Curated annotation (Swiss-Prot):
Its EC number is 1.2.1.38. Belongs to the NAGSA dehydrogenase family. Type 1 subfamily. One of its GO terms (cellular component) is cytoplasm. InterPro entries: AGPR_AS (IPR023013), AGPR_type-1 (IPR000706), NAD(P)-bd_dom_sf (IPR036291), NAGSA_dehydrogenase (IPR050085), Semialdehyde_DH_NAD-bd (IPR000534). The keyword Magnesium does not apply. It is found in: Cytoplasm. Pfam families: Semialdhyde_dh, Semialdhyde_dhC_1. This is N-acetyl-gamma-glutamyl-phosphate reductase.
Length: 346
């Protein structure tokens, strides 16, 4: 066995954290040295998650303040915004960091403040590479600090980034109707997320005011080489555990056809293992739940010169923990799909 990378998962008891632990347990090049959380300290992870048996991992959950950074190579942060940046201040000179919060995704501290509040270490934002793996692969290879994208941005940017970069669709009339499983709201107890509140209902929330909007717009502006892109974005909570579907409505540039768009996406992602253009599989989240895949379908719109793109991912995997492991593999020069070759759940 080659040298195993020693890692800590901070925020290991949340939905994303425990998914990350599950993936890392199957990674042949990883040794999980610490599991950290503010709750369940001193307990095994199996006490909260029965599918993570103590036969797989017998490490008790500890406080972050009790870990020895000198024993670590990489720290994964699965924390709420604000909490990650406080820890990064303490560790950025010591270990590699893969952050799954929003703290280092937005490059402009003023925009971050507008949507999230005061940033605790704005001077470190520039050190982080935005971890949309298929777009920033080479930058991730060279970096020690990765800011993993949010789930909604991942599902939207994978199809839109190349289309705006290639000027195939208009940038002034982008509409996104996105739907997420309840796990996207996190594990904390909230009345709106209780079974009786979400079962048998679909709920729109934070209409045109979701915190992922500036993250998406930032990357679209970069793709299109302009600074004035705004999109209509409506997120919806659907009564399923996991899975995400984004329906994206676009107007084509003059002279561009649906075939041009489809061929452009096929060409752009020809070497990307986890992005597949497949209309049949893109119309259901069953194609991706339990995997790190993103399936894209391109369909004609009802109005002239319009198209509809459907993008499906697992919000906990390609939208969070899976993409974090994908970035880890790229950062460490491992095979990109290592520990990620799952087939979908039924």
């Amino acid at each position: 066995m080659s040298y195993q990378v020693s890692v800590a998962v901070v925020g290991a008891t949340g939905y994303v954290g425990v998914e990350l632990v599950r993936l890392l347990l199957a990674h042949p090049m990883v040794k999980i040295r610490y599991l950290c959380a503010t709750q369940s300290t001193g307990k095994l992870l199996s006490s909260s998650y029965f599918h993570i048996s103590q036969n797989y991992i017998s490490i008790s959950v500890s406080s972050f303040d009790d870990i020895d950074l000198d024993k670590l190579d990489v720290v994964f942060l699965c924390l709420p915004h604000g909490a990650s940046s406080e820890i990064v201040k303490k560790i950025h000179n010591v270990v590699k960091v893969i952050d799954l919060s929003a703290d280092f995704r937005i490059k402009d501290p003023d925009i971050y403040k507008q949507w999230y509040g005061v940033h605790y270490c704005p001077d470190l934002i520039k050190d982080f590479v935005y971890g949309l793996t298929e777009i920033y692969y080479e930058d991730i290879q060279k970096s020690s600090f990765i800011a993993c994208p949010g789930c909604y941005p991942t599902s939207v940017l994978i199809p839109l980034f190349p289309l705006l970069r290639l000027r195939l669709v208009k940038s002034n009339n982008i509409i996104v109707d996105a739907k997420s499983g309840v796990s996207g709201a996190g594990r904390s107890v909230k009345q709106d997320n209780l079974f009786c509140e979400v079962y048998d209902a679909i709920k729109s929330y934070k209409v045109s005011n979701h915190r992922h909007i500036p993250e998406i717009e930032q990357e679209l502006c970069f793709a299109a080489c302009r600074e004035d892109i705004n999109l209509q974005f409506v997120p919806n909570l659907i009564p399923v555990k996991r899975g995400m579907m984004s329906n994206i409505y676009l107007e084509l540039e003059v002279g561009v056809s649906l075939t041009d768009v489809r061929e452009a996406l096929l060409l752009f992602y020809r070497d990307s293992f986890f992005v597949v253009v497949d209309e049949e599989k893109a119309i259901t989240t069953r194609s991706v739940v339990g995997t790190n895949y993103c399936y894209l379908g391109i369909f004609p719109g009802r109005l002239p010169n319009t198209i509809v793109i459907i993008s499906v991912i697992d919000n906990l995997l390609k939208g969070a923990a899976g993409q974090a492991v994908q970035n880890f593999n790229v950062m460490m020069s491992y095979e990109e799909k290592l520990a990620l070759s799952n087939i979908p759940y039924f």
